[in-house]
């Protein structure tokens, strides 16, 4: 009898496992779809069309038919018959229909939709087509938990509406929806007997919420005004309503265990441990408590939060939870790790019995030494197979699914991370993206169920995201030569041999980084606090980059008025000046070390001129303006004090990133206004100090100079309230031509040269007490 039971169990288990593997985890993930009616999704999809091409929207008819294609995958069908006026598009969801509409615009009308600008010139006669496309996987995912702070933090509903439209146009059917959670925590903490002061000292300012949520730090940039909570609740309802109307599944947050310091006072018997010091944040802002997931209080708090969240926003049964982001558990004991993950999951299922836990897989990259195979297997497999969905967060450079054996049976999404900190700088690993998605999808016994975009910041290098979104339907790698030619045509609105040559050079150069260990944190010499010991590696042929610049400028007669052409010309000019700035730095440092005053002074003056030119060209384009970032922040304030607080948050994040420069320049931005009022003053002070050392024959004091830069430039910039333009200043094309005339002949660096520079993620300074006390003022006022 016992043998029969064992055989029966084996048959059931084997059948179940094969069913999961063969049907994309249908049993455990099949319920992850919105419950919105076909009629509502149809109307929402047509709404996207109206907002995008209002004058031509009547030429397109979108409908939803969930039975159009195979279960578990999205399908769209596009039909435009000869002589007919209307293009009919049917999709299995609102997202699928909208995706099909974008596919038609892109590949039949040669149009372009992007974060930068749109090119929507439709042909007089719409092309005929009869095409059916089915997605390659179950999911197309979007967002990184950090994107909410680096890019989305100051968005109003109009900007969110545009982004949700963009998601649908690109087939995104799974996305984070993190707005408003602090308002929920406010309610929960009050029910748990915390005072308002307890809560205020824990919740960070808006620009730093992502890292407060993950337990990396607390309180900095706060306190959060009540108006922020009210606004974010309203905004989250708008976001969720629209996502669900279109068929996009929102991923809500779950309790990860990070709690305010007040928990120690209120719950002295609970198992609480201080989180580790993250990036040298001092005690005032570091180290919240971690409530051990195995403690009964964890389930209580987690259930309270999730119940309150669902009562407010509803649910689609998938929750993100990252307990150990850039932190490690207190022990590597396998039993403990299994208990921890099981307890985290149980806190979800106590409220939602069909909950799926989404885990960002960054911990397996960032703390690889801790997360060995045994530790990872123990942590992952204590959750039922298929009830955890893992984001393989940086698959294009650091895929973990091979090392961790397809996450020991848990499904995962192949993600392109691509960007850290929302920094600017031309970069891509285009060959990796074009090949490795299919390696993951075709892996024997693999558990890949989707593709994803997981940048820390957006509004940069759109070409990489345009390609990556296509991996959701492609069944084999793209012909990149052809693809880049078509990209230039779509983006600028016409065929031009010079634009095509420019993009082919960029494809094979700056967008084809083949070094998996390349540090792509956007750490460029001119953007960082000056020192004598900096190095930077240029992985591409800078001669070819300069040739691309020549070619793109030669396309100006045809595309002078094209918004995306102007953007790209500014961006490429910015990259050229960035590279040249690194060259000048290397030359002047060598001259300083050799005591050659003449060469030093010549190159120091050239660097000052270069930075002025950089600010000039950046200020000519809407997408590179500090003023837009600051005004968006202030617009959310309901009082002068709130506007002041939000502006401080906005300025600090892109410069000091912390009260004392804990993550200095990690999220630096090459924007007009930042260069002139932050980068250039730092370089002026540094170059003046070096010059004095040479002329007067006294030793250069790097520590003293860094302290001066901190106190005289960096801190004042974060506290300043000067206004900056929100509209472009000057003609981008004409300014780029002038910059080209000045600098083109001086571009001579050979490919692969190392420029002295090496960056540490943490570079905080020691300053006197009372020197940096803005937060006490804000706290008193709120």
Q: What do these predicted ranges mean?
A:
Residues 2, 6, 16-137:
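Contiguous, structured surface segment used for ligand recognition
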Residues 5-22, 770-779:
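Cleavable N-terminal signal peptides of Sec/SRP-targeted secreted and luminal proteins
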Residues 23-34, 80-84, 144-148, 220, ...:
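Acidic/histidine-rich, surface-exposed loop or edge segments in extracytoplasmic proteins
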Residues 57-59, 63, 111-126, 132, ...:
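Catalytic-core regions of glycoside hydrolase
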Residues 137-156, 167:
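Active-site-adjacent substrate/metal-binding segments within catalytic domains
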Residues 535-560, 565, 570-593:
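C-terminal substrate/ligand-recognition segments
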Residues 671, 675-759:
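Extended, compositionally biased alpha-helical segments that mediate assembly or anchoring
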Residues 755-772, 778:
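C-terminal GPI-anchoring signal of eukaryotic secretory precursors
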């Amino acid at each position: 009898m016992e043998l029969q039971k064992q055989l029966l169990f084996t048959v059931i288990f084997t059948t179940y496992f094969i069913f999961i593997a063969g049907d994309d985890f249908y049993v455990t993930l099949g319920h992850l779809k919105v419950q919105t009616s076909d009629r509502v999704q149809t109307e929402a999809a047509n709404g996207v069309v109206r907002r995008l091409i209002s004058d031509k929207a009547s030429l397109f008819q979108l409908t939803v038919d969930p039975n159009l294609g195979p279960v578990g995958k999205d399908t769209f069908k596009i039909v435009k018959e000869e002589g007919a006026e209307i293009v009919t598009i049917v999709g299995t969801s609102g997202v699928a229909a909208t995706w099909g509409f974008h596919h038609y615009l892109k590949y039949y009308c040669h149009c372009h939709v992007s974060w930068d600008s749109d090119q929507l010139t439709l042909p007089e006669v719409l092309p005929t087509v009869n095409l059916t496309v089915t997605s390659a996987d179950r999911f197309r995912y979007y967002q990184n938990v950090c994107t909410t702070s680096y890019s989305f933090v100051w968005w109003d509903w109009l900007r969110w509406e545009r982004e949700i439209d963009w998601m649908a146009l690109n087939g995104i059917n799974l996305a984070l929806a993190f707005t408003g959670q602090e308002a929920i925590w406010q309610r929960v903490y009050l029910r748990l007997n915390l005072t308002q002061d307890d809560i205020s000292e824990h919740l960070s300012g808006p620009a730093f919420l992502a890292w407060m949520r993950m337990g990396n730090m607390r309180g900095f940039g706060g306190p959060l005004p009540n108006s922020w909570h009210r606004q974010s609740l309203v905004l989250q309802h708008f976001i969720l309503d629209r996502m669900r109307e279109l068929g996009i599944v929102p991923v809500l947050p779950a309790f990860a265990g990070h709690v305010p310091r007040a928990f120690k006072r209120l719950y002295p018997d609970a198992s609480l441990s201080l989180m580790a010091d993250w990036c040298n944040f001092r005690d005032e802002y570091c180290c919240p408590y971690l409530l051990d997931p195995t403690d009964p209080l964890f389930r209580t708090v987690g259930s309270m939060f999730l119940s309150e969240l669902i009562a407010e926003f509803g649910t689609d049964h998938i929750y993100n939870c990252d307990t150990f982001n850039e932190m490690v558990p207190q022990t590597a004991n396998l039993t403990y790790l299994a208990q921890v993950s099981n307890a985290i999951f149980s806190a979800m299922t106590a409220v939602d019995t069909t909950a799926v836990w989404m885990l960002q897989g960054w911990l397996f990259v960032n703390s690889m030494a801790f997360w060995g195979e045994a530790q990872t297997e123990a942590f992952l497999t204590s959750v039922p197979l298929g009830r955890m969905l893992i984001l393989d967060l940086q698959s294009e450079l650091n895929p973990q699914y091979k090392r961790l054996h397809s996450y020991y049976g848990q499904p995962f999404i192949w993600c392109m991370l691509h960007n850290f900190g929302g920094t600017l700088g031309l970069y891509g690993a285009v060959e990796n993206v074009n090949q490795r998605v299919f390696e993951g999808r075709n892996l024997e016994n693999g558990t890949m169920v989707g593709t994803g975009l997981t940048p820390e910041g957006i509004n940069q290098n759109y070409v990489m995201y345009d390609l990556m979104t296509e991996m959701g339907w492609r069944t084999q790698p793209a012909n990149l030569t052809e693809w880049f030619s078509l990209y230039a045509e779509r983006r600028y609105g016409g065929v031009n041999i010079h634009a095509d040559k420019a993009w082919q050079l960029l494809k094979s150069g700056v967008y084809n980084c083949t070094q998996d260990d390349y540090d792509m944190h956007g750490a460029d010499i001119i953007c960082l606090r000056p020192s004598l010991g900096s190095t930077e590696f240029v992985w591409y042929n800078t001669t070819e980059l300069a040739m691309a610049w020549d070619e793109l400028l030669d396309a100006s007669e045809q595309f002078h008025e094209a918004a995306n052409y102007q953007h790209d010309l500014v961006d490429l000019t910015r990259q050229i000046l960035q590279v040249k700035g690194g060259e000048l730095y290397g030359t002047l440092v060598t001259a300083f070390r050799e005591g050659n005053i003449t060469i030093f002074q010549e190159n120091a003056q050239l660097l000052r001129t270069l930075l002025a030119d950089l600010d000039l060209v950046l200020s000519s384009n809407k997408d590179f303006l500090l003023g837009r970032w600051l005004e968006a922040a202030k617009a959310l304030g309901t009082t002068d004090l709130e506007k002041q607080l939000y502006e401080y948050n906005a300025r600090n994040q892109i410069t000091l990133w912390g009260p004392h420069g804990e993550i200095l320049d990690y999220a630096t931005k090459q924007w007009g206004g930042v260069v002139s009022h932050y980068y250039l003053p730092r370089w002026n002070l540094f170059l003046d100090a070096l010059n004095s050392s040479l002329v007067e024959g006294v030793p250069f004091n790097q520590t003293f100079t860094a302290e001066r830069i901190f106190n005289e430039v960096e801190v004042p910039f974060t506290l300043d309230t000067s206004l900056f333009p929100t509209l472009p200043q000057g003609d981008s094309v004409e300014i780029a031509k002038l910059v080209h005339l000045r600098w083109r002949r001086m571009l001579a660096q050979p490919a692969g040269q190392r420029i002295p520079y090496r960056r540490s993620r943490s570079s905080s300074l020691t300053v006197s007490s009372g020197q940096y006390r803005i937060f006490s003022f804000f706290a008193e006022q709120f």
